Amino acid sequence: DENAVTYLALAAMLVKEINPDAITIAEDMSGMAGLAAPFEAGGLGFDFRMAMGIADHWIKWIKEKTDEQWSMGEIWWELTNKRSDEKTISYAECHDQALVGDKTLIFRLIDKEMYTSMNMDSKNLVVDRGIALHKMIRLVTLATAGDGYLTFMGNEFGHPEWIDFPREGNGWSYKYARRQWSLCKPDYLRYKYLMNFDSDMIHLFREENL
């Protein structure tokens, strides 16, 4: 659709004319080349594009294989498979996993044990393993991001539940239209330390310019 492509390129140019400091990010499922390439080089001129396949692959690996079966070569390929002329933003989890009908990364790793064994005193190998993998997934996704890294709300501390906005199917309920940031406050819950890991991870990469 040439008209649509022209519109997007003009919109990206207009944004920069109005506010040169603005950042434009393209979210595209088609894999169209050039979205985040300079307009002068034949691109559409967005600053970044989402690396949308990464989050889908993390869920695929977790659902279809045990972590002992994960291929390091395959993981490396998917995390670094990007066009050199476009800046990309990587992320380990997005709304596709967190909305009702699916499960968040950490819930797939720990499942029902999250409701009973996330306190610091519990000795549960499923929880310990799930938390360790959750940390490594975020760390390697950030380490290979290159241009930008995104955290979907709640993923930084392992939020246990999905998101569901009020709709006819749930009786217009607001019960799951939330993120429970209060889980990060108590010292006796592991969520606080997952959040601390995320903060330290971001700080390290920023300070060391990685």
Where are these predicted regions, by residue range?
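A short, structured beta-strand-centered segment in the mid-to-C-terminal lobe
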Residues: 182-196
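Conserved alpha/beta catalytic core and glycan-binding cleft of carbohydrate-active enzymes
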Residues: 2-177, 185, 202-210
